[in-house]
Amino acid sequence: MADDRITTFRAPRADCDAEFTEKRSRFIGSVRTVLSADEAAEIIKKFPEIYPKANHHCWAYRIGTGTALEHCSDAGEPSGTAGRPILGVIKRHELTNTLIVVTRYFGGIKLGVRGLIDAYKAAAELAVEQAGAVEMEFHNALLLRCGYDYSKTLDTTLRKWGFTEERIKTEYGEDVSVRLEVPLSMRRSRRCARARSSRSANGTKRR
């Protein structure tokens, strides 16, 4: 769930798979960007096909900001030894829209509860470290149309308001169509400015 007071969020820079071995057990941490629980479920279902001989595919995801949607699974490992440690890594790095699946090939030596927690956490940490993180910004899409005689004035005004070339896409047809990406941070700053202006006006007394 999105919180309109939050204008940015952290997400994985790229999908990534990272592997390490602990007491002959092979752990593969996989980071994926997801936008919904359904998308996460579809990706999770593919891992037994990708690694058909693996013993476990444990996972956790966190989606949205504010009251984020969080779920995790131990996938057959002892309760609390896999899913929660993986989710803890996602939260510790302040990531969202993030799914991590840790695949395990059992190597014949039991790791114990503490060993499993440490191994699944380490696999998730390694994958996140290699994937990297990027700061993303929420924005709204806006479509403007005007005549050709007004297009230059509109372009000048938009740039004066802080819209860069990357956020402006102009199409020319019977009229001029301008598609904008409006960052929520820009909307909030303008709302705050209007609120301050309104308070100043209301607080002015004639003498």
What do the predicted segments below correspond to?
Residues V134-Y150, V178-L180:
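Short glycine-/aliphatic-rich beta-strand segments at the starts of folded cytosolic domains
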Residues I117-H139:
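Long, charge-dense
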Residues C146-T164, R188-R191:
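Short amphipathic alpha-helix segments
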Residues T96-F106:
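Glycine- and acidic-rich phosphate- and metal-coordinating loops
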Residues S79-K91, F106, L116-Y120:
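Conserved mixed alpha/beta catalytic, RNA-binding, or beta-rich assembly cores of soluble enzyme
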Residues A11-C16, E125-Q130, L154-R167:
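Short amphipathic beta-strand starts and helix->beta connectors
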Residues L180, S185-S189:
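Terminal, non-globular segments
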Residues M1-G80, R196-R207:
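C-terminal regulatory domains involved in ligand/effector binding and gene-expression control
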